[in-house]
Curated annotation (Swiss-Prot):
The lineage of its organism: Bacteria, Pseudomonadati, Campylobacterota, Epsilonproteobacteria, Campylobacterales. Its EC number is 6.1.1.23. This is Aspartate--tRNA(Asp/Asn) ligase. HAMAP family: Asp_tRNA_synth_type1. Keywords: Aminoacyl-tRNA synthetase, ATP-binding, Cytoplasm, Ligase, Nucleotide-binding, Protein biosynthesis. The keyword Phosphoprotein does not apply. The record marks 31, 81 as: Important for tRNA non-discrimination.
Length: 581
């Protein structure tokens, strides 16, 4: 090796030792002929000092930012008052007796470690962006988590199996990335949205316990926590029940967090889907703070406010939710109340009513429409005290859940009620099997999930053996017990409006495999990128992927996607139509 130590490994215990270090010039300073260089490698920074009397001085004087250096010298203590407590190596420096410039660099277009730089520019020069020790530490966490995943699951008897990347297009919710076949003219492979069907087939193959750190692809609109290609920890096991998979996932997450320096407690809290929606307006609630939504529709059945009264009289389809904010009367001004109303309107609210809890009175636009006894019950039910404010959401239940859940989270963020150093896990269970979207029936998870009762008249009341693991308000993973009988799978396809012919065309191989003695089985997939984002306290999923895509699904570094030449298209039997003008 060209070096004896990494930069940040050096400390006071090395004073008087001859060392050789390698890295990049982070900063260069010339103080009256004495040259100071902050040398940076993956571990951190150490200060180099070169006096005018040394042979290395001429070379040191020519060094500039991002030059690649090999430096040799003796470690000494920094002078009194010259220590740098911000650096791990801030008590020492290296006095140079030899310096080699291995490579030069022009002035870099971005400052290493400067996160204020436009993200697209950072991604264009990602190889520079990744030079910071902070970036390296993120990928050290990612590596440690991957190793811990393999060790943990192997210890529990799981077999790692790789499933195909080139596969068949199947409807799993998002659009597929299609790959044209050169050999089979006019036919296409699809990149897998998940290994779902293959891992089920492995259970039918008798593999019993499977896992894979799998690359998945979805052609969907991007958000801060989405990428067109992403990684998940994929798990499937046979002859199991929901409890078995939950136990495996909890022990796995405990091992991963422990490997990354954090201990978590298991088992995790559980919450039925219906309760999560009613109490938090979300199927992935953040429980690092309390502030639940409370149903108060019954208190408005006899209200003199016609709008609230009409809403309250249809308790099956509507909701009136109260959100009591502790200390909110002091926090919210007329201006911030207006901003809160503007916020919920963006998500379908018609307005935002409220009641302020004063010392000797209740104030707000709703007070005059509610009887004194109902007001007393309201205050008691939401546990309101002097200085609090109660917000109200009223209307169709799904809309109210959504905007009141978002308001709950926004208020907690604005009032700084969330402990950023806390990890709060939660299982959401008993999901609906189906949902209606613009009149069309869809599977809430996916169509291979085991339903609890297919004979209910109202299809939206059918629940499934499905479960999501949530961490700090982010869905970390989801899974289910799978359908293992072809008759049930065919019935689910039928309820989803998938014809017998379509089911045969798209899933014939699965239906046939199910008919050959498929065992009861189930599994879970945990979003690996999201997990690392939370473990490393990163702001975006793009920070934890070495070469991510932008929110426009492009790569500024390689300029992908790009056009290809006509010869390549001809080989694939493809002709690109010019966009009509």
């Amino acid at each position: 090796m060209l070096r004896t130590h990494l930069c940040a490994e050096l400390g006071e215990e090395h004073i008087g030792t001859e060392v050789q270090v390698c890295g990049w010039c982070n900063t260069y300073r010339d103080h009256g002929g004495v040259v100071f260089i902050d040398l940076r490698d993956k571990s951190g920074i150490v200060q180099l000092v070169c006096d005018p009397s040394t042979q290395a001085h001429a070379i040191a004087s020519s060094v500039r930012d991002e030059y690649v250096l090999v430096a040799k010298g003796k470690v000494r203590a920094r002078g009194a008052g010259l220590e740098n407590p911000k650096l791990k190596t801030g008590m020492i420096e290296i006095v140079l007796n030899s310096l080699i410039i291995e490579n030069k660099s022009p002035t870099p277009p971005i400052a290493i470690g400067d996160e204020s730089v436009n993200e697209e520019l950072r991604l264009k020069y990602r190889y520079l962006d990744l030079r910071s020790p902070k970036a390296y530490n993120i990928f050290k966490i990612r590596s440690d988590a991957a190793i811990a995943t393999r060790n943990s699951l192997q210890k529990m008897g799981f077999l790692e199996v790789e499933t195909p990347i080139l596969t068949k297009a199947t409807p799993e919710g998002a659009r597929d990335y299609l790959v044209p076949s050169r050999v089979h003219q006019g036919e296409f492979y699809a990149l897998p949205q998940s290994p779902q069907l293959f891992k089920q087939l492995l259970m039918m193959s008798g593999f019993d316990k499977y896992f894979q750190i799998a690359k998945c692809f979805r052609d969907e609109d991007l958000r801060a926590d989405r990428q067109p290609e992403f990684t998940q920890i994929d798990i499937e096991m046979s002859f199991c029940e929901q409890e078995d998979i939950i136990s495996v996932a909890e022990n796995l997450l405990k091992d991963i967090f422990s490997a990354c320096g954090t201990e978590i407690e298991i088992p995790f809290m559980r919450l039925p889907y219906a309760q999560a929606m009613e109490s938090y307006g979300s199927d992935k609630p953040d429980l690092r703070f309390c502030m639940p939504l409370v149903e108060v529709g019954d208190l408005f059945v006899d209200s003199s406010n016609a709008i609230f009264k009409n809403i309250a009289q249809d308790s099956k389809n509507n909701r009136i939710k109260a959100l009591c904010v502790k200390g909110g009367d002091t926090f919210f001004s007329r201006k911030t109340l207006g901003e809160a109303e503007d916020f919920v309107r963006k998500f379908g609210a018609k307005g935002l009513a409220y009641i302020q809890i004063k010392e000797n009175e209740l104030k707000g636009p709703l007070v005059k429409f509610i009887s004194e006894s109902a007001l007393n019950e309201l205050v008691s039910r939401v546990k309101a005290e002097v200085g609090d404010i109660i917000f109200f959401g009223a209307g169709a239940k799904k809309i109210v859940w959504d905007y009141m859940g978002r308001l709950r989270l926004k208020v907690a963020e604005d009032m700084k009620l969330i402990n950023e150093n806390e990890y709060k896990f939660l299982w959401v269970v008993d999901f609906p099997m189906f949902e209606k979207d613009e009149g069309k029936t869809k599977a809430l998870h996916h169509p291979f999930t085991m339903p609890n009762d297919l004979d209910k008249e109202d299809i939206e009341e059918i629940t499934s053996v499905a479960y999501d693991v949530v961490l700090n308000g982010i869905e970390l993973g989801g899974g289910s017990i799978r359908i293992h009988k072809d008759s049930i799978q065919k019935r689910v396809f039928e309820l989803l409006g998938i014809s017998t012919q379509e089911a045969e065309d798209k899933f014939g191989f699965l239906l046939e495999a199910l008919s050959f003695g498929a065992p009861p089985h189930g599994g879970i997939a945990i979003g690996f990128d999201r997990l690392i984002m939370l473990l490393s306290k990163s702001q975006s999923i793009r920070d934890v992927i070495a070469f991510p895509k932008t929110q426009r699904a492009t790569c500024p570094l390689t300029l992908a996607p790009s056009k290809v030449n006509d010869e390549q298209l001809k080989e694939l039997h493809i002709r690109v139509k010019n966009e009509l003008k």
